[in-house]
């Protein structure tokens, strides 16, 4: 895998499980983790404020979580969005569940930055265009610095 900072990352097996076991790290580090979940900047896409919440348990569907796990996962999503809003990272977000075949369930917390509206007026219908734009135009030192700063804010707020 190539991470958002254009670095090659090696791991074995399921990438979410490998990340939870700390087999690889992101340049910005993990924003938050507990016994059941990880929260981090998206690994591959250089979009400031684009976070991923993933269970540490290897499951591939939302229904595979217990009610307690679902409640906790949504609390992490809600808290992350509140932190990002309070720090003026973004005002609006899309929250997407990714249940790919033979892949680990995770939730995308996708900020709706102004540039996205210019690239794709209907962001959820044209998500591929937004992601392609980020990969092509946002791999810059300025973006990496923003990602680091935002991750530090989220980490600090979760650890208070």
Please place each PLM-identified region on the residue numbering.
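HIT superfamily nucleotide-processing domains
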Residues: 1-160
């Amino acid at each position: 895998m190539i991470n958002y900072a254009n670095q090659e990352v090696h791991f074995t097996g399921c990438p979410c499980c490998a990340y939870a076991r700390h087999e690889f790290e992101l340049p910005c580090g993990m924003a938050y983790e507990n016994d059941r979940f990880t929260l981090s900047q998206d690994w591959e896409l250089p979009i400031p404020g684009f976070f991923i919440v993933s269970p540490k348990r290897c499951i591939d569907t939302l229904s595979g979580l217990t009610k307690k796990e679902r409640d906790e996962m949504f609390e992490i999503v809600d808290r992350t969005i509140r932190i990002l809003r309070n720090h003026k990272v973004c005002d609006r977000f899309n929250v997407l569940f990714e249940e790919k075949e033979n892949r680990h369930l995770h939730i995308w917390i996708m900020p709706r930055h102004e540039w996205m509206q210019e690239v794709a007026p209907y962001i959820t219908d044209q998500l591929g265009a937004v992601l392609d734009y980020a990969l092509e135009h946002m791999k810059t030192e300025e973006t990496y610095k923003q990602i680091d700063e935002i991750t530090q804010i989220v980490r600090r707020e979760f650890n208070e």
